[in-house]
């Protein structure tokens, strides 16, 4: 009776263990499906984040290269402008000065010759012809008028242009200063723009790293849950195997063995034969 109750109890425990095992298997399958879905959902954002990070890194590199190119071009333009302005100033002004000095020297020589001609008016005609020839040569060289003198020379077109060139030197320098200021402002604006862009990129990268850390923590949590479920399943498998072995051992003990059955059968046949022999002996005596 105790063995029967024990067998019933073990069978009930085995059935409960099987039900729990089926439930655990269903939960494990569901967790596996959720993990697959979760990995699929996480792989797409991860790839998107990787592509975004790569694109933004490429944009930052391109912006840095473009900034370097712009700065180099601006420096080249400024240097070229400065060299052109300085070369023009040093080329134009000395030419004007040399031309003015040469014209002043020629005028002084002409005045000296005229004075000498007036002083030596009583000289020979050869000196007069020489002076006329020199005067004609000067007039052909500098395009003098017939009535030109030292006072009207300063009102000539070349002289006016010379003074205008001198007066236009300061506006050229002012324009150069304005251009340098504009270039400086442009460089400052470009640097501020790149600083703001760099700050935005850093903020975006920080946000992406935070999202990646959150996703990793979620994946680790799901993995721990899955490992716990697997360990519980292994424990239930061990309990199920133990219950099966106990049920099998109790069933073997309750069922009689064939040898004992054969021995009992042989004993009963011997007893029957002895009884028959006794009855056969008793019958002749009675007769």
From Swiss-Prot:
The keyword Coiled coil applies. It comes from the Eukaryota. One of its GO terms (cellular component) is intermediate filament. Residues 248-287 are annotated as: Disordered. Gene3D superfamilies: 1.20.5.170. Keywords: Coiled coil, Intermediate filament. The keyword Coiled coil applies. Residues 1-254 form the IF rod domain. Residues 271-287 have a biased composition (Acidic residues). It holds the Pfam family Filament. Residues 255-267 have a biased composition (Low complexity). Belongs to the intermediate filament family. This is Intermediate filament family orphan 2. It comes from Rattus norvegicus. The lineage of its organism: Eukaryota, Metazoa, Chordata, Craniata, Vertebrata.
């Amino acid at each position: 009776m105790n063995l029967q109750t024990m067998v019933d109890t073990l069978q009930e425990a085995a059935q409960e263990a099987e039900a729990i095992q089926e439930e655990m298997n269903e939960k494990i399958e569901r967790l596996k499906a959720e993990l697959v879905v979760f990995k699929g959902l996480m792989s797409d954002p991860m790839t998107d984040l990787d592509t975004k990070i790569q694109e933004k890194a490429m944009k930052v590199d391109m912006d840095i290269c473009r900034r370097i190119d712009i700065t180099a071009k601006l420096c080249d333009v400024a240097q070229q402008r400065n060299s052109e302005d300085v070369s023009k100033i040093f080329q134009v002004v000395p030419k004007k000065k040399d031309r003015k000095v040469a014209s002043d020297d020629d005028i002084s020589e002409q005045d000296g010759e005229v004075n000498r001609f007036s002083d030596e008016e009583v000289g020979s005609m050869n000196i007069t012809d020489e002076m006329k020839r020199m005067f004609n040569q000067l007039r052909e060289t500098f395009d003098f008028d017939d009535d030109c003198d030292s006072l009207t020379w300063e009102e000539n077109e070349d002289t006016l242009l010379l003074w205008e060139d001198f007066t236009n030197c300061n506006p050229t320098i002012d324009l150069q200063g304005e251009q340098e200021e504009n270039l400086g402002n442009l460089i400052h604006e470009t640097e501020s723009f790149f600083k703001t862009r760099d700050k935005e990129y850093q903020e975006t990268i920080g946000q992406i790293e935070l999202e990646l850390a959150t996703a990793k923590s979620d994946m680790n949590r799901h993995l721990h849950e899955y490992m716990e479920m697997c360990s519980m399943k292994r424990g239930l498998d061990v309990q199920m195997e133990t219950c099966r072995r106990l049920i099998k051992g109790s069933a073997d003990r309750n069922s009689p063995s064939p040898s004992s059955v054969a021995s009992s059968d042989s004993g009963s046949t011997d007893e029957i034969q002895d009884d028959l022999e006794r009855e056969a002996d008793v019958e002749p005596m009675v007769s």
